[in-house]
Amino acid sequence: MELSALTAVSPVDGRYGSKTIALRSIFSEFGLLKYRTIVEIRWLQKLAATAEIAEVPAFSAEANQFLDAIAANFNEADALRIKEIERTTNHDVKAVEYFLKEKVAAMPELHAVNEFIHFACTSEDINNTSHALMLKEARDTVILPEIRNVIDAIRKLAEEYRDIPLLSRTHGQPASPSTMGKEMANVAYRMERQYKQIANVEILAKINGAVGNYNAHLSAYPTVDWHKFSEEFITESLGVDWNPYTTQIEPHDYIAELFEAVARFNTILIDFDRDVWGYIALGHFKQRTIAGEIGSSTMPHKVNPIDFENSEGNLGLANAVFTHLAQKLPISRWQRDLTDSTVLRNLGVGVGYAIIAYTSTLKGISKLEVNRDALLAELDHNWEVLAEPIQTVMRRYGIEKPYEKLKELTRGKRVDGEAMRQFIDGLALPAEEKTRLKAMTPASYIGYAIELTDKL
C-alpha cells in the first residue's frame, strides 16, 4: 500500500492530515534533515569567520551564498539523497555530513575545507540544535498562532455575551448568577497566562562535544575560547538560547517546560469544551446546523456537540504524549543513553493532536448561538438564588439569624418572586432597602460580571 490519508497508521497524518499540514515541514523526517543541514552549514560558516582557525579561511561572498542557498532551498530530493546515503552509513547524522560534502564538491573553495563539515561535533550537537530550531519554529509559527485564535474566539464570545445573565452552578446546583460573557472571560484570562508562559520558555541548545567539555575542540585549537564560540554560535548563528552546562546531550528540561505549559493550556481548553458541552445540553446554547450534516445514523433529529467532543478527545491524547515527553526526556543515564532518541522523534505527535483539537474547538465555537430565552426562563425558575443577597443585607442591619431564616425559606425548595417579596416585606429593614431588594431579580443579581468582562 502507498502511504496516503487512507493508509496512514496515525490519524494525525491520515484522517486529520489536512489540519496538521503546517507541521509536516517542521516535525517530519524531512524537517529534521532540513534543520540538521542548516546547523551543519552554519557551523562551517562560523568556523570560517574565526581568524584563529586559519585552516578554514574566511569564505568569499560567493561561498557563503552557495551555502545559504543549500539551506534555503533544501527540498525533498535533498532529503531523499540523505536517506540514500544513510542506507550505506547506517548513521543518519553522518549521512548529512556526506551529503554536504557532495554538495560543496561543486565549489573548489568549499571543497578544500570539506573535512571541517561536522568538525569536533558529536551527533547530539547537531541533533539538539536541530530540535531547538524545530521547536522554536513550531511554537512561534504554529502553536502560538493557533492558541491565539482560540483565545480570540473566546474573547469574542465574552464581548458578545457580556450582559446575558446566566444561572451559575456550583456542585451542579443553582448558585449566584453571572453572565455568559463573564464565564467566557474567566477562560480567556486563564488562557492568556498560559500563552505568555509558552511564549517565554527558553529554547535551549548546546554545541560542546561528546561529553560537554569541548575535549576535541581544545585538542585541535587550544587557543580558541570555545566556550564563548559556542555561545555565539547558539545565540547568534542559530537564534536560540545557550545552555553552557551539559553532558553529551542537552538535558531537555526546556522541552519539558514547553510541553508542560502547552499541556496546561490544553487542560484549560478541556475545561472549556466540557462546560460548553454542558451548556449545550442544558439548552443555553443552540448549534447552527450545516446543510447535509447528519448527527446520528438512527436519530434524524440529533445535532450533537461533536466539535467540542473531538477537541476534548484529542487534547487528552496530546497531553498524554506531552506528559511522557516531559517525564522521560530530562532523564538520561550518566553522560547519555539513547532512550531519548526514539522519543524525540515524536515531538510532533503531541503537537499534532493539539492542533487538531484547537481547530475543532474553533469550529464548534463558530456554530454557537446563545439561547437568551432559555437562560432567562431558567433564572426566573430559580428565585431562591436571591437568598444570598437578602441574608447579606439582613446581616448588615443586625437582624437575628438571617442565614437560618433564608435557609428555612429556600433550601431544597422552589420559591417564586412573590414569595421572596413577601418575605422581604416582613423584615425590619429600612424602606429604601426593602425597595431595592424587591426590585432585584435573578437576572439582575450579577454583581460586577459585566464590568469585569469589559476590563478583560
UniProtKB/Swiss-Prot annotation:
A GO biological process held by the record: 'de novo' IMP biosynthetic process
UniProt keyword terms in alphabetical order: Lyase, Purine biosynthesis
Quaternary structure (record): Homotetramer.
rRNA-binding found in the keyword field: no
Assigned GO CC terms: cytosol
Keyword Lyase: yes
Any one GO molecular function term: N6-(1,2-dicarboxyethyl)AMP AMP-lyase (fumarate-forming) activity
Top-level class of the enzyme under EC nomenclature: lyase
Designated name of the protein: Adenylosuccinate lyase
Pfam families listed in its UniProt record: ASL_C, Lyase_1
UniProt note: phenotype after gene disruption: A reduction in the expression of purB leads to a reduction in the efficiency of infection by a Vibrio phage.
Cystine pairings recorded for this chain: none
Annotated catalytic residues: 171 (proton donor/acceptor), 296 (proton donor/acceptor)
Gene3D superfamilies, alphabetized: Fumarase/aspartase (C-terminal domain), Fumarase/aspartase (Central domain), Fumarase/aspartase (N-terminal domain)
Pathway membership: Purine metabolism; AMP biosynthesis via de novo pathway; AMP from IMP: step 2/2; Purine metabolism; IMP biosynthesis via de novo pathway; 5-amino-1-(5-phospho-D-ribosyl)imidazole-4-carboxamide from 5-amino-1-(5-phospho-D-ribosyl)imidazole-4-carboxylate: step 2/2; Purine metabolism
Family recorded in the similarity comment: Belongs to the lyase 1 family. Adenylosuccinate lyase subfamily.
Signal peptide: none
EC annotation from Swiss-Prot or TrEMBL: 4.3.2.2
Binding site for N(6)-(1,2-dicarboxyethyl)-AMP: 15-16, 90-92, 122-123, 248, 297, 302-304, 310, 336, 341-345
